[in-house]
Amino acid sequence: MSDSDSDASIEPPTQGFADSTLTATEPPPNPLMESLKQEIDLFDKLYGKQRGFSETHGKEISRAERKREGYISTTLTYGEIKFETFAELMNILKGRHGAMKEDGGVFVDIGCGIGKPLFGAALLHKFDKIVGIEILEDLYKVCVETMQHWTRHVKPVLGEERTQDMQFSFLNNDFLIADWSDADIVFMNSTCFNRSLMIDLSAKGKALAPGTIVVTTTKRMVGPAFDLVEELQMEESWGDATVYIQKRVERS
């Protein structure tokens, strides 16, 4: 989408409204975002200008490695979700689908890139374990480096009680090989995954316990092992995408 200039002018206010202000274009306050000011600030410490990161940092790293190694599969195309959007998604999972009612649980990101959903999840809920699986080594290395920034800049703010029992695991591996069967919530930015890969992921996902929530973008898990419980539109790094929320059910 490109920006365009408008030549339209605003008429001066009519008599009797000289003191009125134009507020129609101002977005209303978002109560959720207002309550997450600290988390937004901490996320920016991990992925913002303080580390020299641009909004396209992960995409640039991914593109450079794929070009260097000669990887041509479109399933490796990079995409990520914004923190504010991810926070809204996690709030929906908690409010509508029974997730994260108590501390604990395991969060897994399939194809985690530079780790934004991983550390976003850690800021939003006290998980027992957070697992990121990423096959591109350079992206995986950023996750490991970000863990150092988490320890140095985020843990002291959140406090020992909030973070001491939280374990992080970063796997530089193929997510069809790695074990993620203990997940309570699985997230995957699957917009660029092809149907064959989604079929394989769905087969792999049968190892998940019934009740496990699986969140995907654009493409959803296939087969009777997963029930669709909600479909919505959310903002991704490249624009709006369909988000599917599914639950693992006992039938296979």
Write out the residue ranges for each language-model feature.
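Conserved class I S-adenosyl-L-methionine
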Residues: 103-113
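Conserved SAM-binding loop of SAM-dependent methyltransferases across substrates and taxa
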Residues: 116-127
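Conserved short alpha-helix immediately C-terminal to the canonical SAM/SAH-binding motif I
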Residues: 117, 138-139
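Conserved SAM-binding motif I beta-strand of class I
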Residues: 129-134
